[in-house]
Every structure is written in C-alpha cells, then in structure tokens.
Amino acid sequence: MKWRRRIEQSHLLAAILGRMIAGYLRLCNATTRWTKVGHEDLQAALAQGPVVLVLWHEFSLMAPVHWPLRHGQLSSLRDTSPIGMVSGVVQSRFGLDPMAMSAKMSNRSASREILRRVQQGKSIGLTGDGPLGPVHVVKDAALDWARATGCPVFVYAYATRRHKLLKTWDTMILPLPFTQGVSVYQRWQAEVPRRAHDAAMAGLRADLQLALDTAATTAKP
C-alpha cells in the first residue's frame, strides 16, 4: 500500500501522524468520565519495582494514555512496521519509552536490551496477541518476559460507551470523545517458573488468556 511505503520512507510523516493521533487521544481522555479499576493495585506494585504489562492488541490506543507515568516508566515493545512506527510516536508523546523489536534483532540482543531497561526500573509493556494475531491467542512472548525478568504481570483493558470498531485484524477500539469509560488493571496471580515443560506453558497461556478476557469484561461500562 502506498501509505505504508510513504511512512517507511518518511520519519517526518510518521511523526506528524503520531502527533495527530496523540492529540485526538488526549481529547478523548479529557472529555471522558473514567471509572478506574485496579489502578491503586498497579501503583502499589510499581512502588516495589517494574512490572510486565500485557493487553490485547485491540486496547492499544488508550494504553499509553492510562499508564501512571509518575509512578514508573514503561518501555513498550513495538514492531518496525509503518503502523508500529506511528505507534512508537504516539507512545513517546505520552512519555513512554518504546522499543522497536526488529525481526533482524537476535533473541539474545533483544533479551539483553529488555533486561537492561528493567534494571533501570522501567516496566515492560506488550500485547498478548500482537503484532498480527491470531486475535485473543496469547503468544509466548509475554510469558517469556515474565520469566526472564521475574516481574509481576498486570493485564490492562478499557472500554467506552461511545466508540468505533476499526476494520483491522483485531477490531481495534477507537474511542470517541464526550462519553463514559472504564479502564482496568488487574494483577495476574500466576507465576512463570524459570523452567516449565510444554504442558505447563500451555496451561499458563490459557490462564493468562482468561485474565485478559476477564479484564476486558470488567472494563465494559
């Protein structure tokens, strides 16, 4: 698609689009009457150190807006696609520290960089089913980073009464201004052991998927 090539070839265009989207999200946030669920639990956990934040890809737009930045920095993982580039700009506009995960980057290099950020006190954020699905199917990345970092895992979801569902693979939620909404953080109670056999990992994936779905249900206004 032409617009993808244009973004790939122009960091300026990605920056302009990212700023426009961030401005729109600020408007939506400011004009929405939010009910917050679990925010205090997240803040209490952040007082003890970084966390791993996991969400379904459809909730990506408002995640940077709702993150409690004054309680701790979040390094959000993104891909290097044109949409990922714009997403990185949006995240940066809300004070986050996005990290591009290139397919050319070795697992060792990625692990080293992520662990370095955690050691700096930064939490790690990623989508459970991203970047391209299948929708609502948890991939191993969230479990791998929870295991590697030893950080507690929180799941996130939000919903607004007024919104549009985009025609994307994940049916991404686009909030509309002047409405009511709910934003949810919930701690995932399971622990990922340093070593786990395939059956145990399958059980953990199913449990994390249930936690993500539960947060989404809780967020319905």
Where are these regions (language model features)?
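Generic beta-sheet signal
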Residues: M101, T127, V155-Y158
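Catalytic core of membrane glycerolipid acyltransferases/transacylases, capturing the structured
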Residues: G49-M105, T149, K164
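Membrane-interfacial amphipathic helices and adjacent loop/beta segments
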Residues: A15-K36, S75-Q119
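Membrane-anchoring hydrophobic helices of lipid-metabolizing enzymes
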Residues: M1-H66, V89, T179-Q180, G203-P221
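Short, well-ordered, mixed-charge alpha-helical segments that flank or form enzyme active sites
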Residues: N107-R112, G133-H136, R162-L166
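A cross-family acyltransferase "interaction/gating" segment
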Residues: V137-A196
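Catalytic-site beta-strand/loop segments enriched in glycine and acidic/polar residues
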Residues: E113-W145, T149
